[in-house]
């Protein structure tokens, strides 16, 4: 019977730590998280110079990060731009974008300046989830994907 109180105490400590980490992450300045997302995207693009982008592709995450940064900069993102951010063929990117829309992670709206163009943005819930996730990585001391020096990849 003494195991139950000890286990409950351990669970309580773990929960307290998770709450503290989440509060610390929430207290971070949004600009810091935007910079973190921007650096992550830059690191992923740099990696693509050395390895086949399809090999390490994560189109949904690339789209979400791109939209997250664009949202912080108040820049509209077209469907085409979001596809380009994914670093996969356009048809594949459109399928991923459709899935993200179906899951209500992104929202499509008509561009008021160009009625024939559709703008893509993060849903409020997804923006909050991306912020919380990036904040948790920062609170764990995990940096964004490294950006390598601007050296052309070796050929041959």
Language-model features, listed with the residues they occupy:
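Amphipathic alpha-helical dimerization/coiled-coil segments
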Residues: 132-156
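Short amphipathic alpha-helical interaction segments
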Residues: 87-102
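A short, conserved structural fragment
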Residues: 101-111
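Short, cationic-aromatic polyanion-contact patches
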Residues: 111-133
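DNA-contacting interfaces and partner/effector-binding or oligomerization modules
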Residues: 1-27
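Short amphipathic alpha-helical elements of helix-turn-helix/winged-helix folds
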Residues: 66-70
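Short alpha-helical segments that sit at the start of domains
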Residues: 37-65
